């Protein structure tokens, strides 16, 4: 080796000036050095690109308040961004510094070289165990994970849920129909062939309740010593028993007379109406020994005649009348 060098360089290696030949620099393995460890060797554009990529990686890996993938690459201040060194193997992980909670505010990029960051952009994923990283997730992240893990219902389960919903709906409608049937049985109705609808039932119930309210407010005596009648031309009278002990409710059937032959009459073509009375008074007159009985009769309205009458007016105009 020396013979070959002397053959080509008769003056020896000492003839080269020192700036061109440094034994330490010549025999140093440059390939083993990390260019990121020495920030002075990086150019300005390369340094800016490294910082930009580091910030982008941090934003990508930060999920649900914790960075579980990567940590930001060191920039101009590698000691400020680097995670703290691990302690002894037996030292607990709770004593590690620079670790922040998931909800703590993140420090801006880049960090100042002279002071440590207020909170690292990653919650020390390199020094925390998987259990500690999982415990750092906040309540919202846990709820989101639970929603993602919600299992999909099978077709059989969906069919069972639909059947249960249908059964509940049928029971609800059946209870409503039973309630309307009970309401129809407590109010006097017309000799109407078709069963009253729910709307007509409510209208008649409102009128009947108003009639009963008028009786209570007027404080009319309820006496069962006799029964009242419904007079008028062509009218008929159904009397009850005149026994003093009879306190049962009495129904007075009132007929309007023969059907009017005139088509312009409002009652043309309508069947007779039934009136219901819960109170009556006796006015005994000694003249010719005649007894006149009067009663306050509530006459239900025919739903077929309510087309021209608004629903609001029926509460203010209860369908009852005085007959004698």
Swiss-Prot record:
Q: From which domain of life does this come?
A: Eukaryota
Gene Ontology MF annotations: chromatin binding; DNA binding; DNA-binding transcription activator activity, RNA polymerase II-specific; E-box binding; protein dimerization activity; RNA polymerase II cis-regulatory region sequence-specific DNA binding; sequence-specific DNA binding
InterPro entries the UniProt entry points to:
bHLH_dom, E-box_TF_Regulators, HLH_DNA-bd_sf
The UniProt annotation puts the region (Disordered) at 302-324
Any keyword Nucleus? yes
For this UniProt record, the keywords arranged alphabetically read as follows: Cytoplasm, Developmental protein, Differentiation, DNA-binding, Neurogenesis, Nucleus, Transcription, Transcription regulation
What are the bHLH domain coordinates in residue numbering? 160-212
Query: What is the protein's major site of localization?
Result: nucleus
Can you quote a single GO CC term? nucleus
One Gene Ontology term of the biological-process aspect is: retina layer formation
| Record has DNA-binding as a keyword | yes
**One Pfam short name:** HLH
Location comes to: Nucleus; Cytoplasm
Q: What happens when the gene is disrupted?
A: Early postnatal lethal phenotype characterized by a lack of the exocrine pancreas, however, islet-like endocrine cell clusters are formed. A redirection of pancreatic precursors to intestinal fates is seen. At 16.5 dpc embryos show reduced size of cerebellar primordium and cerebellar aplasia.
Query: Which tissues show it?
Result: Expressed in precursors of pancreatic islets, acini and ducts.
> Which PANTHER family does the UniProt entry name for this protein?
BASIC HELIX-LOOP-HELIX TRANSCRIPTION FACTOR, TWIST, PANCREAS TRANSCRIPTION FACTOR 1 SUBUNIT ALPHA
Subunit note: Component of the pancreas transcription factor 1 complex (PTF1) which is composed of TCF3/p75, TCF12/p64 and PTF1A/p48. TCF3 is responsible for the nuclear import of the p48/p64 complex. Interacts with TCF3 and RBPSUH/RBP-Jkappa.
Question: What does this protein do, in the record's words?
Answer: Transcription factor implicated in the cell fate determination in various organs. Binds to the E-box consensus sequence 5'-CANNTG-3'. Plays a role in early and late pancreas development and differentiation. Important for determining whether cells allocated to the pancreatic buds continue towards pancreatic organogenesis or revert back to duodenal fates. May be involved in the maintenance of exocrine pancreas-specific gene expression including ELA1 and amylase. Required for the formation of pancreatic acinar and ductal cells. Plays an important role in cerebellar development.
Q: What is this protein called?
A: Pancreas transcription factor 1 subunit alpha
Lineage start: Eukaryota, Metazoa, Chordata, Craniata, Vertebrata
Gene symbol of the encoding locus: Ptf1a
